[in-house]
Amino acid sequence: MPPLTPQRAAVLAFLQEQAQAGVSPSLAEIAQAFGFASRNAAQKHVQALAEAGLIELLPNQKRGIRVPGGAGRDALLNLPVLGRVAAGVPIGADIGLERQLWLDRALFSLRPDYLLQVQGDSMIDDGILDGDLVGVHRSKEARDGQIVVARVDGEITIKRLERGTERIRLLPRNRAHAPIVVAADADFAIEGLYCGLIRQG
């Protein structure tokens, strides 16, 4: 069996979690949990899992998904999507709960506290694309070279951190963009560490 894609593995983990709670979710509920645009996207994942022998589909039943085993609660995270983060020119903070998604813990290097949607292309050389959902682990501290979500004068951006002897720079990973030099009198704070991403679709 070929390895599961991250999204498909997350759907399987969600189904296992629901099965442990005695629930067989409908396609509409799966689509809502993962932010799919339609039930058809959920159907494709469910059908692929069934063909791989990881779940069973009971015919002619709205809630006809049967999961042989269980993943355990630690395998799943229910993460809030809190707004946008700029991969380009910093954008004004619009932090506020938009939705929540069930995701597999294994997708992230650190345990994320929330997700932000990327806007822009300044981090494409690090594999972070416009529209991606990035996991953010809350932290006020970061090492030189880490990818951080930072607040500069009230605006939010995702960049690589460079701590110079005299000033901090936030480095893009796209030659079309210039580094952000943090002025000495700027209102600057590290909001968190990048710990992985989800590419939907």
From Swiss-Prot:
What are the positions of the active site?
Answer: 122 (for autocatalytic cleavage activity), 159 (for autocatalytic cleavage activity)
Annotated site (Cleavage), which positions?
87-88
UniProt GO BP: DNA repair; DNA replication; negative regulation of DNA-templated transcription; proteolysis; SOS response
Q: Which residues bind DNA?
A: 27-47
From the UniProt record, list the reaction(s) this protein catalyses: Hydrolysis of Ala-|-Gly bond in repressor LexA
Gene Ontology MF, one: serine-type endopeptidase activity
Q: InterPro entries in the record, alphabetically?
A: LexA (IPR006200), LexA-like (IPR039418), LexA/Signal_pep-like_sf (IPR036286), LexA_DNA-bd_dom (IPR006199), LexA_repressor (IPR050077), Peptidase_S24_LexA (IPR006197), Peptidase_S24_S26A/B/C (IPR015927), WH-like_DNA-bd_sf (IPR036388)
Keywords (A to Z) from UniProt: Autocatalytic cleavage, DNA damage, DNA repair, DNA replication, DNA-binding, Hydrolase, Repressor, SOS response, Transcription, Transcription regulation
Residue ranges annotated as coiled coil are: none
Tell me its EC number(s), please: 3.4.21.88
Against CDD domains, the record matches this protein to: S24_LexA-like
Instruction: Please indicate which superkingdom the organism of origin belongs to.
Output: Bacteria
Read off the NCBIfam families from this record. lexA
User: What's the subunit arrangement here?
Assistant: Homodimer.
Q: Which family does it belong to?
A: Belongs to the peptidase S24 family.
According to its UniProt entry, the function of this protein is described as: Represses a number of genes involved in the response to DNA damage (SOS response), including recA and lexA. In the presence of single-stranded DNA, RecA interacts with LexA causing an autocatalytic cleavage which disrupts the DNA-binding part of LexA, leading to derepression of the SOS regulon and eventually DNA repair.
Q: Could you tell me what this protein is called? A: LexA repressor 1
